[in-house]
Curated annotation (Swiss-Prot):
Residues 93-156 form the S4 RNA-binding domain. One of its GO terms (biological process) is translation. The keyword Hydrolase does not apply. Disulfide bonds: none annotated. One of the primary rRNA binding proteins, it binds directly to 16S rRNA where it nucleates assembly of the body of the 30S subunit. Belongs to the universal ribosomal protein uS4 family. It comes from Rhodospirillum rubrum (strain ATCC 11170 / ATH 1.1.1 / DSM 467 / LMG 4362 / NCIMB 8255 / S1). One of its GO terms (cellular component) is small ribosomal subunit. Residues 28-38 have a biased composition (Basic and acidic residues). This is Small ribosomal subunit protein uS4. It holds the Pfam family S4. Keywords: Ribonucleoprotein, Ribosomal protein, RNA-binding, rRNA-binding. The keyword Ribonucleoprotein applies. Part of the 30S ribosomal subunit. Contacts protein S5. The interaction surface between S4 and S5 is involved in control of translational fidelity.
Amino acid sequence: MGKRLNSKHKIDRRLGVNLWGRPKSPINKREYGPGEHGQRRRKPSDFGIQLMAKQKLKGYYGNISEKAFRKYYEEASSRRGDTSENLISILETRLDAVVYRMKIVPTVFSSRQIINHGHILVNGRRVSVASYRVQEGDVIEVKEKSRQMPLILEALQSHERDIPEYITMDLAHAKGTFLRAPKLEDVPYPVQMEPNLVVEFYSR
């Protein structure tokens, strides 16, 4: 099993896309993958296209492990309705995804870090598990003593991202309410995500 990448720049380079739409992505400077000159491009197979769609979605949410990601797919497929839409809804209820959407932090990786370090409360109680599943109506906030962290202050003042409609935010108190699990069209992905191809990958 290969080592999981935990660097946003390394993931961008591996996939060849600016996954989070960040100005400092190495993809903005060149159009080839890792290595001195990248790899010669070939027409991808159906499998390759499906695999890339899966890797993009996994990578976007902080390079979730294959074991965890497959469990999300299995849960999505067991629910009523469209499996691809269900998968997006599940991923967007992860606590690290919600904290990232709230603009409390600049990246999903830093979101995971401040959660693991105990800086986040859900309904007034500390939650230190990044994969914790947020429910409709949950209130997520930064601990009062942690609100002056430079990382958090800079992220809250940034104009790089917008807060989606399925979260209401009190920026002054670094507090937000999760209104509902979104559909694909509601999620502000900076690159095209194709969860339908992820479903095809696992359905082979």
